[in-house]
Design a protein with these regions (language model features):
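Non-catalytic cap/lid and distal C-terminal segments of serine-dependent acyl enzymes
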Residues: 1-140
Length: 140
């Protein structure tokens, strides 16, 4: 368990966190890269290829926060890592991430949270951070 973790980016970050909550006996660490806390409205999803911008779905964000709050005790023995950039879609993540941080801090859950200035929601930026994520899990 200590040597097995799960890492995901964007909605994959949500999936990684969910897998860890649902299977706490399996995963020792969880990495959430540019976690897509904000959801997406179906109307925004349909025009995304043309507009290339979303504002998110507050009800989805609140539901995710509630789910984590209700299950935070399942994360108590895991190493957690969260990050996001400051540009593009990633610019929407700071406030929801801060709410998640409050939940984790209130439950005395240990986690690492990093902000990467000028990083956008793109695989090339995720890749630049991957080594640092692994080193955090190995060193802690």
């Amino acid at each position: 368990r200590d040597n097995l973790g799960i890492i995901g980016a964007s909605m994959g970050g949500l999936s990684a966190l969910n897998m860890s909550i649902e299977n706490p006996e399996i995963f020792g660490f969880v990495g959430c890269i540019s976690t897509h806390w904000v959801g997406i409205k179906i109307s925004e999803y349909l025009i995304l290829p043309f507009r290339m911008k979303i504002s998110g779905d507050e009800s989805t964000t609140k539901a995710i926060q509630k789910y984590i709050k209700n299950n935070v005790s399942k994360l108590s023995s895991q190493k957690l890592y969260f990050d996001h950039g400051t540009v593009g879609l990633d610019s929407l993540y700071e406030n929801p991430q801060n709410e998640i941080n409050k939940i984790l801090l209130g439950s005395e859950i240990n986690f690492i949270y990093e902000v990467y200035p000028n990083h956008d929601h793109e695989p090339k930026f995720f890749g630049q951070r991957f080594k640092n994520i692994l080193l955090n899990f190995i060193d802690n």
